[in-house]
Amino acid sequence: MPEEVQTQDQPMETFAVQTFAFQAEIAQLMSLIYESLTDPSKLDSGK
C-alpha cells in the first residue's frame, strides 16, 4: 500500500502544476478579452 501512495504523489503534484499553469493562461485570456471589450482600439493596434 505505501508504494501506491508514493506513485500517486508525483502525478498529483504534476496535475497541480498543470492546473495552476492552465488557470494562469485562462486569467491572461480573460484579461485580454476584458481589455478588448472595454477598449476596442487595442484589437486594431496589433498589441
From Swiss-Prot:
List the Gene Ontology MF annotations in alphabetical order: ATP binding
Q: Which GO terms describe its cellular component?
A: cytoplasm
**Alphabetized UniProt keyword annotations:** ATP-binding, Chaperone, Cytoplasm, Nucleotide-binding, Stress response
Q: What is its main location?
A: cytoplasm
Task: Give a yes or no for keyword Phosphoprotein in this entry.
Answer: no
The compartments listed are:
Cytoplasm
Report the domain of life of the source organism.
Answer: Eukaryota
Q: Does the keyword Nucleotide-binding apply?
A: yes
Main role? Answer: Putative molecular chaperone that may promote the maturation, structural maintenance and proper regulation of specific target proteins.
Give the family, as the similarity comment puts it: Belongs to the heat shock protein 90 family.
- Describe its partners and assembly state: Homodimer.
Extra facts: This protein is found associated with eIF-2-alpha kinase.
* Entry protein name: Heat shock protein HSP 90
Native organism: Oryctolagus cuniculus (Rabbit)
The taxonomy runs:
Eukaryota, Metazoa, Chordata, Craniata, Vertebrata
